[in-house]
Design a protein with these regions (language model features):
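Short glycine-/polar-rich loops that comprise or flank the Walker A/P-loop
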Residues: 63-67, 187-189, 213
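Walker A/P-loop-proximal flanking segment of P-loop NTPase domains
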Residues: 1-45, 49-58
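Conserved nucleotide-binding/hydrolysis micro-motifs of P-loop NTPases
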Residues: 34, 73-77, 165, 196-201
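Residue-level signal for alpha-helix termini/capping positions
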Residues: 31-32, 59, 150, 184
Length: 213
């Protein structure tokens, strides 16, 4: 049987990703220029593949860019979000395990982290964070990409897939308020937040006073 000449059900990369030239160009222009982006489209319409393709191109074009990817689809608690957020940041900005651990020690000072090594090469390192006062720890974690960007002289882009799923968390309002407060003050970090449920995404981003712009 001949192999099907396209990818389905997973992120299409390299020769499996074609076209969408204008979309890739726009994403690179906005995110590379420090403008936050929100994307909405149904599941399986290629948002994740588009973002990945555009960001991999941008990393080649702008050597100071580091891209961090987080999938929020299966996050079920505020603490889990912070753990996965920190893991995604460290994975995106540090090229080796030794550098990731050094970044943990240097940039996450109020938290006692432990390191979990997975066999999955895509998510090879996960960080488990032992929280002290949640408010202080949460703000430190959300500010992690900005602290690292300033210290290393880089531009960090954080891409969060299925962002609207976070609105289902029991403590969503607290999480949302903290994200808005912290992210508004960041100048070296840019966010690409994308999801498949239009009404939920519009509820999150639909007001002119939101803090994501």
């Amino acid at each position: 049987m001949n192999k099907i000449p396209f990818e389905y059900g997973s992120i299409a990369e390299n020769e499996y990703f074609i076209d969408r030239i204008e979309d890739r160009r726009d994403l690179k222009t906005f995110l590379g220029g420090g403008i936050n982006v929100m994307l909405i489209s149904p599941r399986r319409w290629g948002k994740s593949s588009l973002v990945k393709a555009a960001m991999e191109e941008l990393k080649q074009e702008q050597k100071d860019v580091r891209v961090c990817y987080l999938d929020a689809f299966k996050i079920f608690s505020e603490e889990e979000f912070y753990n996965k957020f920190a893991s995604a940041i460290l994975q995106g900005v540090s090229s080796t395990m030794e550098k990731r651990w050094a970044d943990i020690v240097k940039f996450i000072q109020s938290i006692s982290p432990s390191l979990t090594i997975n066999s999955d090469p895509v998510n090879a390192v996960e960080v488990n964070l032992n929280f002290k006062p949640l408010k202080e720890s949460a703000e430190e974690i959300l500010n992690l990409p900005e602290k690292i960007a300033k210290a290393k002289g880089i531009h960090v882009i954080v891409c969060i897939d299925e962002f609207q799923q976070l609105a289902n968390l029991p403590d969503w309002k607290r999480l949302e308020g903290t994200m808005r407060s912290v992210w508004q003050g960041q100048h070296n970090t840019t966010y690409c937040l994308y999801g498949s449920k239009r009404h939920m995404m519009m509820d999150i981003f639909g007001t002119a006073t939101d803090g994501y712009s």
